[in-house]
Amino acid sequence: MEHYLSLLIKSIFIENMALSFFLGMCTFLAVSKKISTAIGLGTAVIVVQTLTVPLNNLLYVYLLKDNAILWQHLGVNVDISFLGLIAYIGVIAAVVQILEMFLDKYVPALYSALGIFLPLITVNCAILAGSLFMVERNYTFQESMVYGVGSGVGWALAIAVMAGVREKMRYADVPKGLEGLGITFITAGLMAIGFMSFSGIQL
């Protein structure tokens, strides 16, 4: 249990997708203007990461990797791990499509607010990175579930904090040359420096 808790904390704070690895920054900067929209997208990312990382773990273990379980049962040794990227993106696209249909039907206001950025979750590098890190680190199915939740929560936390800061900055006297994305990049950098303080924690 302690191992899973350590993995969860590590994936949220120490290895934060947005502020440690700088993944998913296009969506991170574009949707962090309002805190309500940021929380909505952050929740969507948590759901997608929580589902896709363990699903892709099963896909990798049972089908893709060298001497996978399926091929062992068939008595052949096949390595189709080179299809990993296409397979992972396919799983992510399917999950995002289901989520998009769900939001369109049950939460239309959030669906309209997210607009084009919801289908763009499919090609959000932070989402794909979750599955790639899972394979690289050879996580078990249980570890994949924990890592999926943690990496999604970490990204959602980062975008929610950024949105809160940007809403406050509307009332700040920002220099003319730094208005808009200029001050946003500086803020993201300062937040990343803050998250660097977690890197000294040994778990």
UniProtKB/Swiss-Prot annotation:
Main location: membrane
Subcellular localization, as worded in the UniProt entry: Cell inner membrane
GO function term, MF aspect, one: oxidoreductase activity, acting on NAD(P)H, quinone or similar compound as acceptor
Biological process, per Gene Ontology: respiratory electron transport chain; sodium ion transport
Transmembrane domains' residue ranges: 11-31, 35-55, 82-102, 115-135, 145-165, 181-201
Membrane topology type: Multi-pass membrane protein
InterPro entries associated with the record: NqrDE/RnfAE (IPR003667), NqrDE/RnfAE_oxidrdctase (IPR050133), NqrE (IPR010967)
Enzyme class: translocase
Domain of life: Bacteria
Family: Belongs to the NqrDE/RnfAE family.
Subunit text: Composed of six subunits; NqrA, NqrB, NqrC, NqrD, NqrE and NqrF.
Function: NQR complex catalyzes the reduction of ubiquinone-1 to ubiquinol by two successive reactions, coupled with the transport of Na(+) ions from the cytoplasm to the periplasm. NqrA to NqrE are probably involved in the second step, the conversion of ubisemiquinone to ubiquinol.
Protein name: Na(+)-translocating NADH-quinone reductase subunit E
Gene source species: Dichelobacter nodosus (strain VCS1703A)
Species classification: Bacteria, Pseudomonadati, Pseudomonadota, Gammaproteobacteria, Cardiobacteriales
